[in-house]
């Protein structure tokens, strides 16, 4: 992939605040550093809840949410963007992968006191057809055990489990809480201890 970069070179001499890559810095209402000028989408930054900073993550989810907020605010409302976790997913052949929050590399670059755990499990019970391996990685605060990020990979059900992790990170859940989280169980869909429960329980 060639990657994405903001097409904002025409703003170079306007004085508008931008990141080094040209992304327009905005606040939680979509306002730029120039009064009455708003921005949203792949040209603008988003606030990352874990990094606690304005970052460039050009995703359709972020663009749509901020577009709605900017539109509402231009119409006289006072709506605020609650922040992103950079949740994303991909399908390659028969494999799917999802990520949310920060990666272990991010944690290192941020000089966080963190721990990580990696587990291999199955997506559901062995007596139902379609059982596949599933892999979960968690990054969490070493002191508080608050979950900071995670990735899930497998042939089936990886992305939806990533959505659960996104909810857990947004709610500032700990690994202990994830380990005991009451998730749905039926033999075709999960095991009595879901892979996410297991990942939480081994994160000490």
Protein language model annotation of sequence segments:
Residues 2-4, 42-43, 88, 93-94, ...:
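Glycine-rich beta-alpha junction loops
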Residues 17-21, 77-88, 113, 117:
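A short alpha-helix-loop-beta-strand transition element characteristic
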Residues 21, 85, 102, 133-135:
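Short beta-strand-initiation
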Residues 1-69, 164, 168-171:
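FAD-site-proximal beta/loop scaffold in flavoenzymes
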Residues 29-30, 89, 128:
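Short secondary-structure boundary/capping segments
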Residues 26, 40-103, 188-204:
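A conserved FAD-binding loop/helix module that cradles the flavin
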Residues 95-100, 109-204:
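Flexible, glycine-rich terminal cap/loop adjacent to redox cofactors
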